[in-house]
Amino acid sequence: MQCIKFLLVAVGCILSFSSYSQQGHASVSGVIKDSDGQPVPGAVVVLKNTHQGTQTSADGAYKLDNLAPGNYILLISSIGYTGDSVALTLRENQQLVYNSALASDHGGLDVVTVTGKTEQEKIKESGFSVNSIDVTRLANTTADLNQVLNRTSGVRVREQGGVGSDFNFSINGLSGKQVRVFVDGIPLDVFGSAMSLNNVPVNLAERIDVYKGVVPVNLGADAMGGAVNMITNQKIKRYLDASYSYGSFNTHRAAFTGQYTHEKTGIVLRSSFFYNYSDNNYMMRNNPDYDVEIRTVENGQFVNKDSRRFHDRYQSGMGQIELGVMNKKWADVLFVGFSSSFYTQQLQTGFRQDNVIGNNTKKGESFTGTLRYRKDNIVKGLNFNAFVSRSRDRYDITDTSFVKYYWDGNSMPSAVTELLNNEKTITDISRPRTFGRVNLSYELNPNHSFNLNYTLDHTRNHNYNRLTADEDDIPGLLQKHVGGLAYQQELLKKRLTNTFFGKFYGLNLEQKHWVSSEGGYVKQKDFVTNYGYGIATRLRILRDLGIRASYEYTYRLQETEELFGNGINVIGNPNLKPESSNNINVGAFYGIKNEKHKLFIEVGGFYRDAKDFIFALADVRSSQMIYENKSNVRITGVEGEIKYNYKTLISFILNATYQRAINTTKFTGPESSVPEATYMKRIPNQPWFFSNAELNIGKDNLLGRNTRIQLNWYSQYIHWFYLNWENFGYVGGKSDVPTQLIHSASLTYSIKKGTYNISLECRNIMDAFAYDNYRLQKPGRSFSVKLRYFIK
C-alpha cells in the first residue's frame, strides 16, 4: 500500500511537470539608505502591477530575483521618507543593481503607496502549514525562545519549573522528540545538551519558523510532529548586540552576539555567547483543592504549608566563534567554527512534586567543531550547501543519598536513594557525535526547481556507574540516515505552487541485550529502513486571499534517551520501534495592508494518525518513566490567528487552538482480543484548548528625537485537562490540571534609534497559580530589568 501511494505521488509529480521554456531570468538588487547614508530597514520594494515585492533587511539591502526580461517600474516606500520610483528594462540573465537614497518626509508629502511582503509573510503564505515569527521586535525583552514560541497558535511549551527546567514542546498535539529544533537548518542539539530553547536568549535569533506536521526536505530530519527553525542574523556585515538582565529569584542573564567583516579580504568573524544563572527559589504554594500539597515536618508531625524551593539552582553558558570568508568565486560561504557549552542543574523534584529531592545535581559540558560551506550557481541554477560537525556531549548525575526530603528542607532516612535506586550511583553518560548534511538545489527555470538533501547522524552512547565500573563495556550506537528529494512547480503566473517530495529513513542500531545462556549482556545489531512522501500546495485565489493544503506520511526514529535512558528518571527501552504518522493540514489566509494598516487572518485544521506512537509512561509509584509504543493515536484540531498593525503605534495578536488526541488502539496487544481500557479516550497530560493574546503600544520620538517607548501586554489561557486517563478513578477524584489565565507585561525605552535600550518586565502579574507538565508548580509573580546595547 505504501509503495502504491508513493508511486501515485511520483506519477502526479511527473504529469504536472509543464514544459515551460527555460528563458533566462533576471534580478534587481541594491541598498536603500537615508540622506545621512544610514541604511533604511523595512523599506518596501516592489515592481508595479506584479506580485514581486520584498522588504529591505536590517542593513537596507534588498533583492528581487526570478524576473522575466521586460520593462518594469520599481517602487520604493518607507514610513517617514518620500518614495522613489524608477523605470527599469531587464535583459535576459541581467543582474541589475539599483541603490536609492530616500529623503526624510518632514512636510507630509505624498508618498508612493506600495504593498510588498515581508519574509515572514511569504513563508506563512507557502503551501506548508508554518508560523514565521519576527523575533527582532522582542530583542529587548527577557524572554527565552520557549516563551516566545509558547505564544504561537498550535504550540504548547510545558515546563517543569523555572529557568533551565526540563520542558515538553508540543505542536498540534505531537510533542517531545516528535518535534525537531534547528538553528539555520542544523539540529540545535548538535551543539550540546546545554543548548536548548529554554535558555537561548531572543537576541541570538532574527526569525523563527514553526513547521506543523509537514516538514520540507531541506531540513533533513525525521520530524513527525513538526520542526522549529531558528534563523540567526547573517545579513548585517558588522554589528554588536550585548545585553544583561537581572530578575526575581536571583536570576541573571547575559548575551552577546556580533559580526565583523573585513571589506578588502572578505574575512568574517562571528561570535555568540550567553550565560544564565538562577536560584529558582520561588515559593511552592499549598493548594489542596487540586491535590497539590506542600508537605513539611513540624514537631514530628506532617504539616502542609507554603515553602520555598531550596535545591533548584541552575546555571548554563555557551560560547561560539566562527571564522571564514564570504562572496568569493570559489565559495559564497566558508566558515570554520568551535563552540563549547556547560550547565549545572540541581534537581528539586521528580516528575511529581511530592517527590522532593535535596542532594542530586546534574552537570554537563560539550565541545563542538563545525565546518560549513555554500556555493551558489556552481553551474547555472545549481546551488550546493554542506555542513559537518564533530561533538562530544557529556553529563553526570550523582545519586548517593539514602534520604527522603520534605519541602521545608528536612529529611528522613530512606531505604532507597532520592531517585529511588537501591544502590549509590554516579551515572556518567558520554555521547560522541558526528553529524553531516549535504544539500543540492537546482532551479530549472523560474517555475520549476528541485531540492536534494541527505543527513548522517552518528551517535555513540556510553552509560555506566562510576562507582562500580571504569567504562561502558558495550556502548550503544544510534546512526540515522535521512534523505529527501523535492520538486516544486509554480503555475498560473505563480498563483499555484505545488511541492512534491519523498523521504528515506535508515536506522542503524547497536545495543546490549541480556542473554541468559551467555550469562550476561551481548551486542545486538539492527538496521531498519522506511520511506515517506508528501505534497504541499498553495492556491492564491485573489492577491490577498489564498488556501493551502499539505500531506505527509512520515517517520520518527528513536532517540538515544528513549533507547538508552538518561540516568535520572528515564529508563531505557531497547524494544522501542520507530513511530509513523499520516499528517494532513488544510488552511486559508487573508492579508491586506497599506501605509497605515496591516491585517492578517489565518485559519487551519489538522489531522494526525500516528502508528506505534511513542508515549512517555510514568510510574505513579516512583519518579521514573519509560517510553513505550502505543499502537494508534489520532489527533484532530483547528486553530486560528488574527494579527493587526496600525503604523508603528499599535499591534495586536490573538490566536486559539483546539485539539483532541485520543487512543485508537482497540486491543491490548497485536494478537490479543482483550479490549484496551483507554480505547477512544483522551491522551492524558495534554492540554486540549488554549489561547494567547498580545497587545503592543509604542510611540516614536515621544521623549526625544530618535527615541521609542513601548508597552507590551501578554495573556495566556489554558483550559483544564486530565493528568491521568479520563476513565480512571471516580468522578470526584479524577486528577486534573486546573484552568489557568496568566498575564504578563513589559515596558521598553529605546534611544538613539535602538542603540541603548532598557526594559522592565513583570510575569504572572496577578500571581496566579501556574501549573504545567505533570501538574508541577511554576513560579508566581516575578520582576526583571534588562539593559541592551545594539550597534551596526
Task: List each language-model region with its residue ranges.
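C-terminal beta-signal and adjacent terminal beta-strands/loops
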Residues: 4, 606-612, 713-792
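Short, acidic, small-residue-rich periplasmic hinge/interaction motif at the N-terminus
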Residues: 33-38, 43-48, 77-81, 91, ...
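Short acidic/polar hinge/loop motifs at secondary-structure boundaries
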Residues: 65-66, 186-213
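Extracytoplasmic beta-strand/coil segments of soluble accessory domains associated
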Residues: 130, 146-187
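A beta-strand signature from Gram-negative outer-membrane beta-barrel systems
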Residues: 202-241
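Face-selective signature of the C-terminal outer-membrane beta-barrel domain
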Residues: 320-343, 362-552, 596-605, 653-655
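Membrane-embedded beta-barrel scaffold of Gram-negative outer-membrane proteins
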Residues: 548-552, 556, 579-636, 657, ...
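Gram-negative outer-membrane beta-barrel transporters
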Residues: 601, 605-609, 628-722
